[in-house]
Amino acid sequence: MILRRGLVLALVVGAAVLASVLLRGGGHDNPTVARVGGEPITQKQLDPVVDHFRLEAKAEGKPFPDNGSAAFRRVRNRLLDLLVYRTELRQAAARLGVKATEVEVVRRLQGSGSAEPGEAIRDSFEYGSVEAQLLLERISAKVTSGIKAPTRAELAARRNRALSRYLARVERETQVRYEPGYAPGP
């Protein structure tokens, strides 16, 4: 009887530890590097973005910092900040009731020449960039829908100010927590 209780207790504790690891970001092979409003950004999300820029630098004949160097950490952390911004956009869009579907993102990519019809999107950075652009367009339309002005130039200026104020508020009000060693610097 005591052995059975001990086994049950061990299973319960083990399940709790496993659940805790999964909720924190997937364990050691995919640690959480930041949280945006409670939503994790993981190492497996950050790595392809870093790889994208590493390949871009190579294609342009420019150096890319070596892994582990201080310069690499600065670049990596700036790229993480980009993922944080995109996550803030997705969360803000959801609160406003706007979205960008996978089909819309792929169509925009195909229209830009980044992907051929029927071709799989291989670069998650490009996909995320197009998704963010579509969301920003829809957020802008929603936030600026009631703005009026006597001229087109003044209308554009008023809309730009309203969108800037909205995005600044989103950034200010969204709680972002970076894991040690990942916070973007000045």
Predicted regions and their residues:
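N-terminal targeting/tethering segments
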Residues: G27-V130
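A ubiquitous, low-specificity "background" feature that marks scattered single residues
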Residues: S20-V21, Q110, A132-E137
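Short, low-structural-confidence N-terminal segments
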Residues: M1-R74, N160-P186
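Acidic/polar surface patches and capping/hinge elements
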Residues: I121-F125, V130, E137-G181
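Basic side chains
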Residues: R4-R5, R76, R86, R138, ...
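Hydrophobic membrane-targeting alpha-helices
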Residues: L18-L22, A92, K142
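Proteins with a high burden of low-complexity, intrinsically disordered sequence enriched in S/T/G/P/A and R
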Residues: V8, A115-E119, D123, P150, ...
